[in-house]
């Protein structure tokens, strides 16, 4: 190798190292409370966010109702990705979130799902037949998807008939687990939990018509503890970008 080539190679390596150090020096961290239904999409988005910006997103997943209580009690989250639009608005009204930062990052879809192929039909008639022992849903007091499930069953006139068969999860992730482990033969889950790249992962599903429940408009909001955090501001902006939107669509959400 010629001396000139060696010099150029060393220069490029030095430049790359300098850029990496500068990138790292400006990287920050953001703590995010994420609605359980958005677990898989957010994990993917967080990886892309870190690759593209150098910022790290630390994620916690759970029910929106539980996060609301934790934030009220001083939990150190910078952002909330809620399963509804009411909780971010309430936090803003109570001075715990920045009202102007609120935006809808996804519109969720409810699904009736079974791990067993053929059990759930494309029209959801299985709810009328009742040919199952247990049906799972998220706690409607804590989880918007659970409240939506109750709306659907009420609309179809099967709520009281099916109530003795309920298995309730604290959040939609636990509800999905009940069905995935077949502790319940079927259950109301987020469509995003059983979809990947626009296709059903396994089992059988009824994508519940949107007319049967109040729209699951999911809002993100910057919490007051996150004000001044550059990584938090960057993630809020990233969620509106093309890469994040493509991920969100791939998991069956609208936005």
Where are the model-predicted features located?
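Sec/Tat signal peptide C-region and signal peptidase I cleavage site
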Residues: 23-27
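N-terminal secretory signal peptides that target proteins for export/translocation
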Residues: 1-8
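Bacterial N-terminal signal peptides
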Residues: 12-22
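Exported/periplasmic ABC-transporter solute-binding proteins
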Residues: 28-61, 65, 69-75, 82-85, ...
């Amino acid at each position: 190798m010629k001396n000139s080539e060696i010099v150029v190679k060393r220069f490029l390596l030095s430049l790359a190292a300098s850029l990496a150090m500068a990138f790292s020096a400006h990287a920050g961290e953001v703590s995010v409370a994420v609605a359980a239904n958005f677990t898989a999409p957010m994990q993917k988005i967080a990886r892309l966010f870190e690759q593209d910006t150098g910022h790290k997103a630390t994620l916690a997943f759970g029910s929106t109702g539980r996060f609301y209580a934790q934030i009220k009690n001083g939990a150190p989250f910078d952002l909330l990705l809620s399963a509804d639009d009411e909780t971010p608005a309430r936090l803003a009204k109570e001075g715990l979130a920045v009202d102007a930062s609120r935006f809808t990052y996804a519109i969720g879809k409810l699904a009736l799902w079974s791990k067993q192929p053929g059990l759930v039909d494309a029209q959801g008639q299985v709810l009328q037949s009742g040919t199952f022992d247990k049906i799972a849903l998220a706690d409607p007091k804590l989880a918007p998807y659970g409240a939506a499930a109750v709306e659907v069953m009420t609309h179809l006139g099967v709520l009281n008939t099916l109530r003795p068969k309920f298995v309730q999860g604290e959040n939609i992730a636990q509800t999905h687990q009940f069905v995935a482990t077949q502790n319940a033969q079927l259950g109301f889950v987020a469509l995003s939990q059983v979809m990947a790249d626009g296709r059903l992962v396994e089992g059988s599903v009824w994508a519940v018509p949107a007319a049967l429940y109040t729209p699951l408009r999911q809002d993100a909001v910057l919490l007051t503890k996150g004000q001044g955090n550059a990584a938090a501001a960057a993630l809020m902006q990233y969620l509106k970008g093309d890469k994040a939107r493509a991920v969100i669509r791939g998991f069956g959400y609208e936005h």
